[in-house]
């Protein structure tokens, strides 16, 4: 291991208008994903697996569900007397559309960076799904002698950076004077003054920045060739543990090529779907190519295709709803059948 050489920084200040149907009541990193996880679980687990023992999360808005999910960081072994998981919301009142940038929020909590003893910092967003070994990125960073290492896949930045903690503090100090708001802008504007090295990541990666990408990359994980690249035995993805009984399959239910979490009651037909915990599918109901989140209740004789149902949705008997692969139909959190019919 790398003996706690790295500090983890997760930038949760991003707002994506194209994900507003899924972020109306939560922050980006708290979006449920892959049947039992939240988006932030992937980057946080990557950091912990690289022996990063101090992780700072900088949320901007609607972060109650994120705080509830992360707690004190026990599931990630970050509930520590020294170092651990830190949560740094903005002390300023603002609207979620305000684009003040992450560096302003970093600067509001500079004492955290001053107290940190780690030599290097890993800075990432909360909405990139991958299973990357940061210890190898750091090794390359040290061998080449870079000021900044930026992680790419197929020529596209994954918005993941490694640099010295000293350099990060310098960039935070200078952000107002030099006119950059985020780490991405800082790297671009300082490219002539700093040695910036690309690191090509060859594993599975998905940047979730729209409903279409959320749907596409979620459905990819039904396929073993994708699932096996993300969920590695030697690099586990951790999440908040919730105890549920095994899923109950009714006498006339059929389930094909689907991911099904615990606690469900399935009495209908499910094909190419992802079902989160405690979902109920009524008799005679058919689901195809759907993502059904926690505690959704679907009545009898419904027909749903290419639908994303957020948490706690209630769908009445004989309801039909469909989207497309490019525009899946999103049923917002807490929606009930009457509201759906009138919308």
From Swiss-Prot:
InterPro entries (alphabetical): ADP-Glc_PPase, GlgDAde_trans, GlmU/GlgC-like_hexapep, NTP_transferase_dom, Nucleotide-diphossugar_trans, Trimer_LpxA-like_sf
Protein name: Glycogen biosynthesis protein GlgD
Stored Pfam families: Hexapep_GlmU, NTP_transferase
Single GO MF annotation: glucose-1-phosphate adenylyltransferase activity
Species of origin: Bacillus subtilis (strain 168)
Record has Transmembrane as a keyword: no
Record family assignment: Belongs to the bacterial/plant glucose-1-phosphate adenylyltransferase family.
Record keywords: Glycogen biosynthesis
Domain of life: Bacteria
Translocase listed as a keyword: no
GO biological process entries: glycogen biosynthetic process
Induction statement: Expressed exclusively on media containing carbon sources that allow efficient sporulation.
Function of the protein: Required for the synthesis of glycogen.
């Amino acid at each position: 291991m790398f003996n706690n050489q790295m500090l983890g920084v997760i930038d949760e200040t991003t707002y994506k208008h194209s994900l507003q149907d899924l972020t109306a009541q939560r922050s980006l990193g708290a979006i449920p994903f892959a049947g039992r996880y939240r988006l932030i679980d992937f980057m946080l687990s990557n950091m912990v697996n690289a022996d990063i023992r101090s992780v700072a999360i900088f949320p901007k808005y609607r972060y109650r569900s994120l705080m509830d999910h992360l707690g004190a960081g026990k599931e990630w072994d970050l509930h520590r007397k020294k170092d651990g998981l830190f949560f740094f919301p903005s002390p300023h009142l603002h609207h979620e559309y305000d684009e003040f940038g992450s560096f302003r929020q970093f600067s509001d909590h500079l004492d955290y960076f001053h107290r940190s003893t780690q030599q290097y910092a890993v800075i990432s967003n909360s909405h990139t799904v991958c299973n990357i070994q940061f210890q190898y990125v750091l090794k390359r960073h040290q061998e080449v002698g870079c000021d900044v290492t930026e992680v790419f896949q197929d020529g596209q930045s994954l918005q993941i950076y490694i640099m010295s903690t000293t350099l990060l503090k310098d960039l935070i100090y200078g952000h107002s004077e030099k006119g950059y708001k985020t780490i991405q802008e800082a790297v671009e504007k300082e490219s002539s003054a700093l040695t910036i090295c690309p690191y090509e990541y060859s594993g599975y990666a998905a940047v979730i920045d729209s409903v279409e990408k959320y749907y596409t990359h979620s459905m990819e994980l039904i396929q073993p060739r994708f699932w096996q690249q993300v969920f590695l035995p030697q690099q586990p993805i951790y999440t908040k543990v919730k105890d549920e009984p095994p899923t109950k399959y009714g006498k006339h239910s059929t389930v094909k090529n689907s991911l099904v979490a615990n606690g469900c009651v399935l009495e209908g037909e499910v094909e190419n779907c992802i079902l989160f915990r405690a979902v109920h599918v009524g008799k005679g109901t058919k689901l195809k190519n759907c993502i059904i989140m926690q505690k959704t209740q679907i009545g009898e004789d419904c027909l749903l295709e290419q639908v994303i149902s957020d948490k706690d949705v209630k769908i009445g008997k004989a309801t039909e709803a469909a989207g497309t692969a490019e525009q899946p139909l999103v049923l917002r959190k807490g929606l009930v059948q009457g509201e759906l019919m009138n919308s």
